[in-house]
């Protein structure tokens, strides 16, 4: 099974993540930030990646460390579960509509982390979550996972819908990219022979 467990303890956060790439989208998420929990639940459900996340963070200071470290830990778990990446589809993309909103996400499990974020969030918060941290979550996740990630909100007005479409787009793109290609199940999807 392609699974991973990550424990990450710093002076700012204590995190435990369990991930199963070949799951059913089952989740148990407790970050202490309600809207982040909601987004990670969407990520799990729509990627079919089972995800357990438990964080005890320094929320009495602010949400930055919890947001950043959750992205790092989930990204590390994804990279660990992928192992040598043998047989994966590697690329994934998705258009994620949500009411008036449409977001496009494309990714490459390349081993070359990069994030392009073209999402304009107008308000300072979603629930209690600082919206400036949302881009940072995606950057932290992509860096730790070793993926090239492009997220572009094409249009939309409701911030909740915009952010949720970003996470659902990521989920659907990941679902495709981590799948085993039955025609190439024993090979690395790169002419270099490694990712």
Swiss-Prot record:
Catalyzed reactions: D-erythro-1-(imidazol-4-yl)glycerol 3-phosphate = 3-(imidazol-4-yl)-2-oxopropyl phosphate + H2O
State one Pfam family annotation: IGPD
GO aspect biological process, one term:
L-histidine biosynthetic process
The GO cellular component terms are:
cytoplasm
Task: Fetch the InterPro entries from UniProt.
Answer: IGPD_sf, ImidazoleglycerolP_deHydtase, ImidazoleglycerP_deHydtase_CS, Ribosomal_Su5_D2-typ_SF
Name the PROSITE patterns on file.
IGP_DEHYDRATASE_1 (PS00954), IGP_DEHYDRATASE_2 (PS00955)
What are the recorded GO MF terms, alphabetically?
imidazoleglycerol-phosphate dehydratase activity
EC top class, as a word: lyase
- Entry EC number(s): 4.2.1.19
Keyword list (alphabetical) reads: Amino-acid biosynthesis, Cytoplasm, Histidine biosynthesis, Lyase
**According to its UniProt record, in which pathway does this protein act?**
Amino-acid biosynthesis; L-histidine biosynthesis; L-histidine from 5-phospho-alpha-D-ribose 1-diphosphate: step 6/9
Respond yes or no to whether keyword Lipid biosynthesis is given for this record. no
> Where is the protein situated, by its record's location annotation?
Cytoplasm
Family as reported in the entry's similarity comment? Belongs to the imidazoleglycerol-phosphate dehydratase family.
Name used for this protein in its record: Imidazoleglycerol-phosphate dehydratase
This chain's source organism reads Rhizorhabdus wittichii (strain DSM 6014 / CCUG 31198 / JCM 15750 / NBRC 105917 / EY 4224 / RW1) (Sphingomonas wittichii)
Gene from which this protein is expressed: hisB
């Amino acid at each position: 099974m392609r699974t991973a467990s990550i424990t990450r303890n710093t002076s700012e956060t204590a995190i435990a993540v369990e991930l199963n790439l070949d799951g059913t989208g089952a989740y148990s998420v407790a970050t202490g930030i309600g809207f982040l929990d909601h987004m990670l639940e969407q990520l799990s459900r729509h990627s079919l990646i089972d995800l357990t996340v438990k964080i005890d963070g320094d929320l009495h200071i602010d949400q930055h460390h919890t947001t950043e470290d959750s992205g790092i830990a989930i990204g590390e778990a994804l990279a660990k579960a992928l192992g040598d990446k043998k047989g994966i589809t590697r690329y994934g993309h998705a258009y994620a509509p949500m009411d008036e909103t449409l977001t496009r996400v494309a990714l490459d499990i390349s081993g070359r982390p990069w994030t392009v974020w073209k999402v304009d969030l107008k308000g300072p918060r979603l629930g209690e979550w600082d919206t400036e941290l949302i881009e940072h979550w995606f950057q932290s996740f992509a860096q730790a996972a070793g993926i090239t990630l492009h997220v572009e909100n094409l249009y939309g007005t409701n911030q909740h819908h915009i952010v949720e479409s970003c996470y659902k787009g990521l989920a659907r793109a990941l679902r495709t990219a981590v799948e085993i290609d039955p025609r190439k199940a024993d090979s690395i999807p790169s002419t270099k022979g490694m990712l």
